[in-house]
Structure formats: structure tokens, C-alpha cells
A protein has these predicted regions:
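Leucine/isoleucine-rich amphipathic helices and adjacent mixed helix/strand linkers
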Residues: 1-153
């Protein structure tokens, strides 16, 4: 926006807008290529990457790596968390084709750049059409774990 304000003429503003549009399309192409790399992985790895991205994109707040690991470790139609299904932090990063980063100080897992978030806000349904249903199933399963039957943990 500051770049547009600094333009002295109408022609300069139009040119700056064209460069901005090309930049957004270029970023979109980069993210599409990353998603194609994810789709080219084996089915289990691809599904894990889709779940990781789905959780990050739909979360109302940043997730810690532990929270994401536990969300990914929940299996539907189970009554407890099996820690054998918790993916490592290295796996969280590696299966997502460079789209996910972890902050070692804060323990937060996030998309690699704010433009990545913007891209997925525009396109998530085409990449992850079942993400909300999946997240709902996992949340219901988690809340149904035996540990919660006796009340608060």
C-alpha cells in the first residue's frame, strides 16, 4: 500500500498495481507447486500433510507443536490416545513441502509466511474440501475418550 501512495502519477500507480498482481499470481503458482509436491507423495504421507495444513488453516489461534501432534495422533472410533501415532516435529515439517515452520522458542507450528495463510484462505476448499468434517470427527472422538468419563482431567 505504501508503494502505491509513493507513486507520483496515475501511470506509475497503474504500473505498480500490475507488478503487485503479478507478484500475487507468482506466489500462488509457488504454493500450487508445493501442493502438487504434496499430492505426489504416497497416500499416507499426503493425507498427513493435508491434515497438518487443515488444522493450521482452520485453527482459531496458533497451535503448539504438542497440540498439533496430539490432534494428528487421534484415531476415530478409539477411546484413548495412542502415542505411537504422534508424528515427530521433523515429520510435521518435512511432509508439507516447505509450507510449515515451527518456532523452537515458542513451540508454535505455523505456515511459513503470512502470504501462505492468505493463499489458503482463498483456496482451502479446493485443496482440503473435507477438512472441517475431519476436524469435527477428531474433536468428537477426543472428547469421547474414556479419560473424560470421570469428569475433568
Amino acid at each position: 500500500m505504501n508503494n502505491l501512495i509513493d507513486q507520483p502519477t496515475k501511470g506509475d500507480i497503474k504500473q505498480a498495481l500490475q507488478h503487485l498482481a503479478k507478484g500475487i499470481k507468482g506466489l500462488d503458482k509457488t504454493y500450487e507447486q508445493a501442493m502438487e509436491r504434496i499430492n505426489d507423495q504416497g497416500s499416507h504421507v499426503r493425507e498427513l500433510a493435508e491434515h497438518i495444513l487443515g488444522w493450521i488453516i482452520h485453527a482459531k489461534r496458533p497451535l503448539s507443536t504438542v497440540e498439533l501432534q496430539h490432534a494428528l495422533g487421534v484415531r476415530t472410533r478409539t477411546t484413548k490416545l495412542d502415542e505411537d501415532y504422534l508424528p515427530s516435529i521433523r515429520v510435521l515439517r518435512s511432509v508439507c513441502a516447505g509450507l510449515v515452520a515451527t518456532d523452537e522458542q515458542s513451540g508454535i507450528v505455523r505456515l511459513v509466511h503470512y502470504t501462505t495463510q492468505q493463499y489458503f484462505e482463498r483456496t482451502w476448499y479446493s485443496w482440503f474440501p473435507n477438512a472441517q468434517t475431519y476436524i469435527t470427527d477428531i474433536c468428537v472422538t477426543y472428547l469421547s475418550f474414556d479419560v473424560f468419563k470421570t469428569g475433568f482431567c
